[in-house]
């Protein structure tokens, strides 16, 4: 924003050299101020507004001339966490009201998942995957996408059957895959998909059930991020996200030996890439 111009003048800047009359420009500015929820802020200067309000004014200025395409280049990166979460919701609602095709560049995966209708994941200038947020997160097409969007525990494995993979001496059940038997692959699972079963092995348990030592717990508000060490997977620590309720219910604590389940439908295989 231009610091020496009022909010009204900032929004009107792109309209002043058009064929619109002064009354039409004033009406458009008033309409946009109402749209972004700042109807009484027109006479103020940018320095008198919060960072979040300034971003909304900048967006109003960008759409004042009625563009057919809008490019937002990391518009929320300079804001604090709470304002960022609030504004991404506001921008999405505003974009839907306007119906303007919008491309938003971001390095914030959570921002992309929450705001986008479709996501393009790029790596060194090349497109890795295009899809809905759900497709990109739940059905990543490459190891880069799987690792970049959200957290992943990664293992080196060998395909041992149509729905089987071997990691060291341990065989895991998984969904059917496209790889031939004996193929070396990278195996991944998301932390939130790992199920804690407790200190004792339940009488009824599914496939892919193992014991592991809980070596680290990090409290992240609504869940605990845990690091687990298992003899079944000597290569790497397993990262698991357990809900606060699950930790309380199962009395989970650091250094405990815990039984966990890796659901077969949550295990994904990709072309092997060295870490």
Give the label of every model feature segment:
Residues 167-170, 229-237:
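OB-fold (S1/OB) nucleic-acid-binding surfaces
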Residues 222-227:
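Short aromatic-glycine-enriched beta-strand elements
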């Amino acid at each position: 924003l231009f610091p020496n111009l009022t909010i009204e003048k900032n929004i009107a800047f792109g309209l002043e050299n058009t064929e619109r009359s002064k009354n039409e420009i004033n009406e458009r500015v008033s309409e946009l101020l109402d749209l972004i929820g700042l109807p009484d802020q027109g006479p103020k200067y940018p320095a008198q507004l919060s960072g979040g309000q300034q971003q909304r004014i900048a967006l109003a200025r960008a759409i004042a001339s009625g563009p057919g395409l809008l490019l937002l280049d990391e518009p929320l990166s300079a804001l604090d966490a709470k304002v960022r979460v609030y504004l991404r919701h506001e921008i999405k609602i505003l974009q839907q009201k306007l119906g303007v095709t919008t491309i938003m560049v971001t390095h914030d995966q959570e921002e992309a998942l929450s705001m986008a209708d479709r996501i393009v994941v790029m790596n060194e200038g090349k497109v890795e995957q295009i899809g809905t947020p759900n497709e990109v997160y739940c059905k990543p097409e490459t190891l880069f996408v799987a690792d970049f969007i959200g957290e992943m525990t990664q293992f080196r494995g060998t395909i041992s059957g149509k729905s089987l993979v071997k990691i060291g001496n341990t065989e895991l059940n998984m969904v059917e895959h496209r790889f031939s038997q004996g193929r070396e692959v990278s195996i991944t699972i998301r932390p939130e998909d790992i199920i804690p079963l407790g200190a004792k092995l339940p009488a009824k348990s599914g496939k892919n059930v193992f014991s592991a030592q809980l070596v680290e717990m990090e409290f992240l508000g609504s869940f605990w991020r845990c690091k687990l060490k298992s003899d079944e997977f000597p290569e790497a620590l397993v990262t698991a996200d357990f809900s606060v309720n699950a930790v309380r219910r199962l009395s989970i604590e650091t250094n405990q030996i815990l039984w966990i389940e890796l659901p077969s439908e949550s295990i994904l295989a990709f072309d092997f890439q060295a870490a």
